[in-house]
Regions:
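Hydrophobic alpha-helical transmembrane segments and their immediate juxtamembrane helical boundaries
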Residues: 1-16, 20
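Short secondary-structure junctions
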Residues: 138-149, 191
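Short edge beta-strands and adjacent turn/loop segments
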Residues: 148-164
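Short, hydrophobic beta-strand segments
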Residues: 161-174
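Solvent-exposed, non-transmembrane alpha-helical starts
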Residues: 175-181
Length: 191
């Protein structure tokens, strides 16, 4: 009976993977604890064959995927975008209230802020103006899917400063283009 252990485990795992639609050929998966990060090429009784992005091949027993965790990127591939979530740290000592002159300068020099009006009774800070600008800039870009979440938030401050988390979805999900898009966007924010 021990001779057939891998075959039996593979068979049961294969049924679980199929019945629960956990994995299909063509899916991009990553398997923690292994070097598997690529496209599923083949699923057999005893192995799942994955072509990694560096063109190496990984083979993993199906029962490993059922008994441990793995990440299937199919949901991202089939969705309307690929998530970008990064933070920009602001020096806590540079955050200050905006004077009326500062607000007027922002409105004149930054077209996206031309129609900005703070809530009544609120004196905005330069950090708040940056968050408003980031949101308006992202919503103006055709590469950003504004039908999905777009959230600009201030996180708990750290020894590195105050993180402004920028969370949005790129319409383009192709890895190379996705990296270029997010790099271009963050280059703009850094400048």
């Amino acid at each position: 009976m021990l001779v057939f252990k891998d075959t039996i485990l593979g068979f049961v795992a294969g049924i679980q993977l199929s019945a629960n639609d956990m994995l299909r050929p063509g899916d991009w998966i990553t398997v923690p604890g292994s070097n598997a990060n690529g496209i599923v090429q083949e699923i057999t009784l005893n192995t799942v064959k994955i072509q990694n992005f560096d063109n190496t091949i990984s083979t993993i027993p199906p029962y490993t995927l059922v008994s441990a965790s793995f990440q299937n990127w199919r949901g991202m591939v089939e969705s309307g975008g690929r998530r970008v979530m990064k933070s920009i740290f602001l020096d806590l000592n540079t955050i200050k209230f905006c004077t009326p002159d500062m607000l007027n300068t922002f409105r004149k020099e930054i077209p996206l802020l031309a129609d900005y009006k703070p809530d009544e009774g609120v004196t905005p800070t330069n950090s708040q103006m940056f968050r408003v600008y980031v949101e308006k800039y992202l919503t103006s870009l055709p590469v950003v899917n504004t039908d999905l979440d777009l959230i600009i938030s201030q996180l708990q401050s750290t020894e590195y400063g105050v993180p402004i988390q920028i969370y949005f979805f790129s319409r383009n999900k192709i890895w190379k283009e996705y990296e270029r898009i997010q790099s271009d966007i963050f280059d703009h924010f850094f400048a």
